[in-house]
A protein has these predicted regions:
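Dinucleotide-binding Rossmann-like beta1-alpha1 core, especially the glycine-rich loop
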Residues: 45-129, 141
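Glycine-rich FAD pyrophosphate-binding loop
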Residues: 20-44
Length: 427
């Protein structure tokens, strides 16, 4: 069969490799000038680094397995990382039993409830019941009103704004579980990265695809999927139709109704009902580390970011210090209309709050990326809201990061969904 894949992110590349291993003919069409999607790298002041941060957890079996398949297991590195929380003007350690005991913003009963909640989340295997519950209600039931207000309310409000009350508990629970299980021992968090960054994996996938006869077409957006008799006929690129038997879309599903005008109205409506939160992600290169933490949650009403990620505290190759600062917000929020420089300036204005020693001459370089479909809004009942990957048009399949639900966004989930798409296509 001739198969066209739309999108050369990890999901599309893994799907292509699976199909090529089964002897199919595969072409991948990518709008960008490089492979990788959100995991693609850029030249940041002489340092090749990813547009958006990624990390690996101990439970990420799919990516760990893929690294083994590609002969890259020795490129996986594990780091003892630290987590922090900035609350009411003070930086606290977080993520260990000792840190919880020392945290003075909640009482002893709240601390016990918090610990029990994490232990409970670590043991959950079936998320179907929590798919019907809101995350806020779930947290308040386990932690109490005060601990929710101190530790979670600000994070929800600054990532989802008016949508913060309509998130599935399953969506949140898998995130808690993934981090809680990624430990060297009870007292030490351990997270992973790939030597050379995600580019190491992406280039290995590219090589494996091309060796098997697959073709990757960059700067080649698919303009339309042609359909005849309710069956895929071809993909139109630069005005030319390329005949194919299957089309697999791995770009945000919101693009699919435009690419495939023949989709039934009801199915297109289900796609359009899936909502996303964009991100404006500031990246800073500093002379020295801002904090000792990889991940810092910010639960402070005077700082309008939910947290920062000091990637260089995970991956020392990304030195001297690399900080990602994500601003999540709906496109309708007035702040989203600001230019990138305004977000960079706002970020820099907060740094001395997080570290009083910070000085302007620490800044070596700044950058800012935007992505419209950064975080899917997953309300209760999201399992039932997601349209099936196999569309009503024969030979047309689709998935994007919303299909990771209830799992966290990660390259590992891209691997899982990419392989699932390949199996569906061949069924």
């Amino acid at each position: 069969m001739k198969i066209a894949i739309i999108g050369a992110g990890p999901m599309g590349l893994v799907c292509a490799l699976e199909l090529l291993n089964r002897g199919e003919s595969v072409d991948i069409y990518e709008n960008d000038d490089r492979i990788g999607g959100m995991s693609a790298s850029f030249d940041f002041d002489g340092l090749p680094i990813e547009r958006f941060y990624h990390f690996i957890c101990k439970t990420d079996a799919a990516i760990i397995g893929l690294l083994g398949e590609l002969g890259l297991s020795e490129r996986l590195r594990w780091t003892d990382t630290r987590m922090g929380v900035y609350c009411d003007g003070r930086l606290y350690d977080w993520g260990t039993p000792q840190a919880l005991l020392r945290f003075d913003r909640i009482g002893w009963i709240d601390k016990a409830r918090y610990a029990l909640h994490v232990l409970h989340a670590k043991r959950i295997r079936d998320w179907s019941a929590l798919d019907k519950v809101t995350a806020v209600d779930w947290l308040k039931r386990w932690l109490g009103e005060r601990a929710y207000r101190v530790l979670w309310r600000r994070l929800f409000d600054l990532k989802f704004y008016e949508h913060s009350g309509r998130l599935s508990a399953a969506w949140l629970g898998t995130r808690i579980r993934r981090i809680a299980l990624s430990r060297r021992n009870l007292l030490q968090e351990s997270l992973g990265y790939i030597d050379g960054g995600s580019a190491t994996l992406l280039e290995a996938l590219r090589t494996a695809i091309e060796r098997r006869g697959g073709r990757i077409h960059l700067r080649s957006p698919v303009e339309r999927v042609e359909v005849a008799g309710n069956r895929v006929r071809g993909a139109v690129v630069a005005g030319v139709e390329h005949p194919c038997d299957r089309v697999i879309s791995t770009v945000p599903i919101q693009y699919v109704p435009r690419l495939v005008p023949d989709l039934p109205d009801g199915f297109a409506a289900r796609i359009r009902a899936i909502e996303n939160i964009p991100v404006v992600c500031v990246v800073l290169k500093l002379r020295r580390a801002l904090t000792p933490n990889f991940w810092l949650n910010i639960c402070d009403d005077t700082i309008d970011i939910p947290g920062i990620v000091e990637y260089s505290n995970l991956n020392p190759q990304a030195g001297p210090a690399i900080v990602y600062v994500p601003f999540y917000m709906p496109k309708t929020h007035p702040k989203f209309a600001r230019d990138n420089a305004a977000f960079v300036d706002e970020t820099i204005g907060y740094l001395s709050r997080l570290n009083p020693e910070f000085a302007a001459d620490w800044i070596l370089a700044t950058h800012c990326h935007r992505y419209e479909f950064a975080q899917t809004i997953c309300p209760p009942g999201f399992f039932d809201l997601l349209p099936p990957m196999q569309t009503p048009i024969q030979g047309l399949f689709m998935a994007d990061t919303s299909y990771y639900y209830p799992e966290d966004r990660s390259i590992s989930e891209s691997v899982t969904v990419g392989k699932t798409l390949a199996r569906l296509c061949m069924a």
